[in-house]
Amino acid sequence: MRERGADLLNRSADVRALDDAHPAYDRILSELAPDEARILRLFANSGPQAAVDVRTWRPLDVGAQTVAPGLTMIGPRAGVRYIDRVPAYLNNLFRLGLIWFSHDPLDDLPAYQVLEAQPDVLGAMRSAGRARIVRRSILLTPFGTDFCALCLPATTAGFEAVAAEAAAAST
């Protein structure tokens, strides 16, 4: 281990060495599902995303409980294949250091209005009785921003064209 540490320090002293990408990026790519790449592209192209928690309402918040945490529209907006896996995808992206769950809301009121009108949010509010919505946000970390810039194409028009050709050929 000491040799590896010494090697790292020696490489860091070499001003001629070019390290375009963090060494973890290769491993991270192998630990991502295709839907997670779509989610990252959504964050890279559209910025932070709205999230809400539905809680029971109690005076002074004493005894209030979270009925439905982390409700978002990230799955549909990213075009993921497995919508029910979005919470697991987000947890994995957080584990990898690519996204951050912020307690701060976005300044984008319409994003929350659309999110709060979704059936899963409305259902959670009904089940909570007197409900309170806590607005939050999810965003890329600086590490995630760099990862997306270096590893993910901004668009997949070429890939989508190939998929469309394959679909047309099979009919």
Which stretches of residues belong to each language-model region?
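Short amphipathic alpha-helical interaction segments
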Residues: 76-111, 117
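Short amphipathic alpha-helical interface segments
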Residues: 17-79
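Extended interaction regions within the primary functional domain
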Residues: 60-61, 66-73, 84, 103-104, ...
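Short, amphipathic alpha-helical interaction segments positioned at domain boundaries
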Residues: 108-170
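Eukaryotic partner-binding/assembly regions in large regulatory complexes
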Residues: 1-26
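Short, hydrophobic/aromatic alpha-helical segments in well-folded domains
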Residues: 24-28, 89, 143
